[in-house]
Amino acid sequence: MDSTNGNGADLESANGANGSGVTEALPPPPPVIPPNVEPVRVKTELAEKKGPVRVPMARKGFGTRGQKIPLLTNHFKVDVANLQGHFFHYSVALFYDDGRPVEQKGVGRKILDKVHQTYHSDLDGKEFAYDGEKTLFTYGALPSNKMDFSVVLEEVSATRANGNGSPNGNESPSDGDRKRLRRPNRSKNFRVEISYAAKIPLQALANAMRGQESENSQEAIRVLDIILRQHAARQGCLLVRQSFFHNDPTNCEPVGGNILGCRGFHSSFRTTQGGMSLNMDVTTTMIIKPGPVVDFLIANQNARDPYSIDWSKAKRTLKNLRVKVSPSGQEFKITGLSDKPCREQTFELKKRNPNENGEFETTEVTVADYFRDTRHIDLQYSADLPCINVGKPKRPTYIPLELCALVPLQRYTKALTTFQRSALVEKSRQKPQERMTVLSKALKVSNYDAEPLLRSCGISISSNFTQVEGRVLPAPKLKMGCGSETFPRNGRWNFNNKEFVEPTKIQRWVVVNFSARCNVRQVVDDLIKIGGSKGIEIASPFQVFEEGNQFRRAPPMIRVENMFKDIQSKLPGVPQFILCVLPDKKNSDLYGPWKKKNLTEFGIVTQCMAPTRQPNDQYLTNLLLKINAKLGGLNSMLSVERTPAFTVISKVPTIILGMDVSHGSPGQSDVPSIAAVVSSREWPLISKYRASVRTQPSKAEMIESLVKKNGTEDDGIIKELLVDFYTSSNKRKPEHIIIFRDGVSESQFNQVLNIELDQIIEACKLLDANWNPKFLLLVAQKNHHTKFFQPTSPENVPPGTIIDNKICHPKNNDFYLCAHAGMIGTTRPTHYHVLYDEIGFSADELQELVHSLSYVYQRSTSAISVVAPICYAHLAAAQLGTFMKFEDQSETSSSHGGITAPGPISVAQLPRLKDNVANSMFFC
């Protein structure tokens, strides 16, 4: 949650996108509707909404508190000279000469470049921006609203599977196929239709900079982004959304398993208070190391040799990757593997010459024999290995493994191992000054001012970082035990010679040890001693349960069951708390089953720890921070909590919600998403929370169970949390509800405002029809590319740095906050968007509340990069996600209707937590 996550390793890049390294287009433009067609509006939840549709609120003012500080940011000023001009939008259709549409990815840019080169005068000498799919833009109109062109393209790779010059599962390569093998570069005819679609005034950009956003302004910005993507594509870059990656080995670092972290650059145009800017940042994606396929598989699976490879796993890993085949040099996309090894996999080979009757006879041969006898290639090692299939499902085309090499710049989109992720983070860190140097160089190399289309419409991009004014908010005073108080320094504090503000008592507890490498007795003695120094009374454990050696190779569930049988046989009743020593330092398979058993079957608070022979005091203090919070204690709190001085909270009963949705790993489309909402309790505290967690259809971002009607009852998340607030706050209903939403993009703000907020209001009304609480709704974004730098220091910006001017939205209420101390890499600020405010906070009040909520995270003695409720929601979703066994979703499933789903989707449900832990900070 600190700058470790803001270090330039843009881990979003492990998600989405195909694994073939093919360029991806931006989202398609709105469809063009012919004038004689009356559009029919599709009914959606937003369209059917009763009452006015909410929109993000406008900024009411700027903050003034804090010490002013000059800063630089990675936004580069964009000047637009020709605001009176227009972009013209054209639809592009590509066909082969026989009329078939071109569906092959990646060929469109080559075809359109050829059109521009061949028909330059017919196009009136105009430059154009092409998105690689079906859309083209020009500055000024083309000579005609509809134009047809024919071009001949020298094909550089044959990715369409038509036999392709290697053994086909149904027939041998034809004479034409064999000729293509000997002459891989062959010409192909294409027909291109370019049709007028729309006109986009550049004046819309000026309107957007005044806060008057429209569909035209969004389209104009989209055109500018497409121009930059085309510019990068012509330099041979891999395009990933709005990022580009050069084929330069010096930009790549190995992270293990023949996977490389490839450094590239994100670029996007933004409308800001200071005008138009280009936001440019360093980003990283994972690519596969080019080279022999067999080398990749051995490294990726950590296999001893080619004969130890797990081929079912290899088939999933290789699917859709591109290979270059020796000796022809042709490129193909992998569609699968053969069922049998080369020396056993057969196909029908058609003889070259007809027989006496003029017929071509066939004979069955193996792939290995074909390559030896016909292609004169003796296989060195792959005769006993499966073949690469580059054909179609019903017409396989097999190539021996050793003849295939992976081509450069292919994204790796599978989930990374813990080791790979750690290596990626470590190797992609950049200190602020290094990042600035790299960005300046990249901007110079990109040479956007020489881009013809930008030049023709009078757009120029400054090479200087934008200067902004920030403010450093003072850290809030914290209260600790025995009446002591402290002011954090540089976003950090400690408990040296201090007690927790509300320490708990641990009386009935046990220790379980799944590890053979931990001195448990020493851990227990030290934990009791250090706990006492923090004010926690810890009795001696009832017993230490050691796992028997005979169980250590058993499946995780069996190991957990055996341990609980042992506990139940020796312990009368359920313990208050269990300390569990896991067998592994990270990602133990026991973690999920162990947590599930404790929380859902027995209602036991449990703390897991990594095995250690000699834990130090700091490690055990950090462990006690979690244990104390889980058992209902408080480690530290804001000094103003529970006092009238905390005016924004203490005057009126106020509940704070943190909302997040956690999705499965890349490629796991069948894994349900997990929605978590946490809520503050025991008003006027803002340091204690509880969570409600539900599953929902995979990749659904809007939370679906905020209200869940079951007959006349509401079984939704919000009711559960509101009832808990009421009972824990002396039977007071919240009059103010403050919501922090994480994980949504700007395009989803309207859904959050008009669907999720409506559901929360409905949940309140279902509890009391006359209840009208006031709402404040903010969205927190970490997945952006804005960074801040100190012009006179190589260090990160100080904790508490806030920016609400110049590069913020020209109309809407947003601000950037760097609450934490960036110790490594470059600090990534959190971008807060205030979407809705009925309460009426001033800019200073709201910014100080958000800043203070970064200091109440009970697991840490440092300010965190985003408010604690959001971190807790993320932790709760992640922890309950480990409960799920998704292999068979047919068991204990129920139906949920997705927002865009045509019918009910069966989603496996999470087991309910026992009541005595449901209201705890079990996730801490």
Swiss-Prot record:
Changing residue 874 to A: No effect on RNA binding, but loss of slicer activity. It comes from the Eukaryota. A motif (Nuclear localization signal) lies at residues 584-591. Expressed in embryos, mature leaves, vascular tissue of the sepals, stamens and stigma, at the tip of the style and siliques. GO terms for biological process: defense response to bacterium; defense response to virus; gene silencing by siRNA-directed DNA methylation; heterochromatin formation; regulation of translation; regulatory ncRNA-mediated heterochromatin formation; siRNA processing. Residues 1-37, 159-185 are annotated as: Disordered. Keywords: Host-virus interaction, Nucleus, Plant defense, Repressor, Ribonucleoprotein, RNA-binding, RNA-mediated gene silencing, Transcription, Transcription regulation, Translation regulation. One of its GO terms (cellular component) is nucleoplasm. Pfam families: ArgoL1 (PF08699), ArgoL2 (PF16488), ArgoMid (PF16487), ArgoN (PF16486), PAZ (PF02170), Piwi (PF02171). Disruption phenotype: Decreased DNA cytosine methylation at CpNpG and asymmetric positions at different DNA loci corresponding to retroelements, transposons and repetitive DNA sequences. Reduced H3K9me2 at IGN5 and IGN26 loci. Interacts with NRPE1 (via C-terminus). Binding to NRPE1 is required for its function in RdDM. Interacts with turnip crinkle virus (TCV) capsid protein P38; this interaction inhibits probably RNA silencing ability of AGO4. Interacts with SDE3. Binds to RDM3. Binds chromatin at loci subject to transcriptional silencing. Interacts with MBD6. Belongs to the argonaute family. Ago subfamily. Together with RDM3, required for transcriptional gene silencing (TGS) by DNA methylation and repressive histone modifications (H3K9me2) of several chromatin loci. Component of the RISC complex that associate with the small interfering RNA (siRNA) pathway involved in direct cytosine methylation at endogenous DNA repeats. Forms a AGO4/NRPE1/siRNA complex in cajal body, facilitating its function in RNA-directed gene silencing of target loci. Required for CpNpG and asymmetric DNA methylation as well as histone H3 'Lys-9' methylation (H3K9me) at SUP and SN1 loci. This is Protein argonaute 4. It comes from Arabidopsis thaliana (Mouse-ear cress).
